[in-house]
């Protein structure tokens, strides 16, 4: 904006601007109006454990690390301890949530099967992965009899579920392929070594796979295969929500602010992501650009009734959820808490065309 004024008017304007800036406690870019407001000093830091569903995490899973390392958690009086699990559907991850030991990722299937917990923040509604295959695989039909990944929880885990969906496109069933369980860190090495013929990989691993072994290729993007699937949400035990709802709301607010910072502050978050993922910076930067361009991370609550209900119906169709135990949207998601957290973060917004 260009101002035209007499010299005296400009002097008054300059003094006004200086006074205004001096009154602000800090200026924060892109993490919500609430963060830029003056906060009272913390009476005490609340120690909270956060579960991350992959060890080491993929780029998409790093908002928890960003919130800790940028001091966003600290501004909300949260002292975060991060625990890495072998899959969001793993017994250890679900037990940590059930027992109120950690806030971690949970899905609709676990809730329908009896997990007494609710989702409170949708970290990444959209699927970021691609199904990567060996050079000899040209179509999904070629996966018959091949070795497919079941990392992240084995049968019922994420890679197993995605492999099942890919097989279905060729009229195949899970018994038509060999599913191989391993640690989540073994996904890319297994494909590179020829131990696997198919695996769902995150963008940074797709980049590294094609760089190290150009014959490997993407069979299908999972967002293309399942455009309405809800990918990743954090949840808390009902006992925790009942006992310390304000704490969970503060966590959700901090994480909404974090995802907004991720979209707006690439130069600050990339080093944090490199450290957390243990991946080369070029691969992390590639993944970051893909995730931002495709609006994988949320910028608001991240919740979508359409995606959640579609995921429930898909699980019923596949036999993962019994039809008579079908959960409602409100049984899966604590909508009110999400709305309260969003309001505290400054309300709804859109960043780079993303608005989930």
Protein language model regions, located:
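N-terminal secretory signal peptides that target proteins for export/translocation
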Residues: 1-13
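Bacterial N-terminal signal peptides
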Residues: 15-30
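Sec/Tat signal peptide C-region and signal peptidase I cleavage site
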Residues: 31-36
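Short, glycine-/small- and polar/acidic-enriched structural segments
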Residues: 37-183, 187-190, 197-203, 218-222, ...
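Second-shell loop/turn segments in exported
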Residues: 55-57, 150-153, 192-196, 239-241, ...
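Pocket-lining segment of extracytoplasmic ligand-binding domains
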Residues: 186-278
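Secondary-structure end/capping motifs
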Residues: 242-323
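Conserved C-terminal helix/tail region of periplasmic/extracytoplasmic solute-binding proteins
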Residues: 313-356
């Amino acid at each position: 904006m260009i101002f035209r004024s007499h010299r005296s008017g400009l002097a008054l304007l300059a003094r006004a601007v200086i006074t205004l800036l001096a009154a602000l406690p800090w200026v924060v870019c892109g993490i919500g109006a609430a963060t830029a407001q003056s906060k009272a000093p913390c009476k005490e830091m609340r120690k909270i454990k956060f579960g991350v569903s992959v060890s080491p995490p993929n780029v998409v899973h790093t908002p928890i690390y960003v919130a800790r390392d940028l001091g966003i958690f600290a501004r909300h009086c949260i002292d975060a301890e991060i625990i890495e699990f072998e899959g969001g559907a793993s017994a250890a991850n679900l037990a940590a949530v059930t027992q109120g030991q950690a806030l971690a990722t949970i899905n609709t299937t676990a809730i329908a099967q009896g997990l007494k917990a609710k989702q409170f923040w949708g970290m990444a509604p959209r699927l970021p992965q691609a199904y990567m295959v060996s050079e000899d695989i040209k179509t999904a039909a070629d996966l018959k009899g091949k070795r497919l990944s079941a990392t992240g929880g084995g049968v019922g885990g994420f890679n197993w579920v995605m492999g099942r969906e890919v097989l279905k496109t060729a009229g195949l069933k899970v018994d038509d392929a060999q599913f191989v369980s391993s640690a989540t860190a073994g996904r890319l090495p297994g494909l590179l070594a020829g131990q696997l013929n198919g695996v769902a990989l995150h963008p940074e691993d797709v980049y590294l796979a094609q760089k190290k072994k150009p014959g490997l290729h993407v069979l299908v993007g999972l967002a293309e295969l399942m455009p309405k699937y809800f990918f990743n949400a954090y949840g808390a035990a009902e006992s925790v929500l009942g006992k310390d709802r304000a704490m969970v709301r503060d966590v959700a607010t901090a994480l909404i602010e974090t995802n907004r910072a991720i979209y707006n502050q690439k130069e600050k978050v990339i080093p944090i992501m490199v450290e957390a993922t243990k991946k080369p910076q070029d691969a992390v930067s590639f993944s970051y650009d893909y995730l931002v361009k495709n609006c994988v991370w949320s910028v608001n609550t991240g919740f979508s009734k359409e995606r959640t209900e579609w995921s429930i119906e898909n699980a019923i169709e596949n036999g993962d959820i019994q039809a008579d135990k079908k959960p409602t949207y409100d049984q899966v998601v604590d909508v009110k808490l999400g709305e309260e957290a969003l309001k505290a973060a400054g309300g709804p917004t859109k960043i780079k065309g993303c608005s989930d």
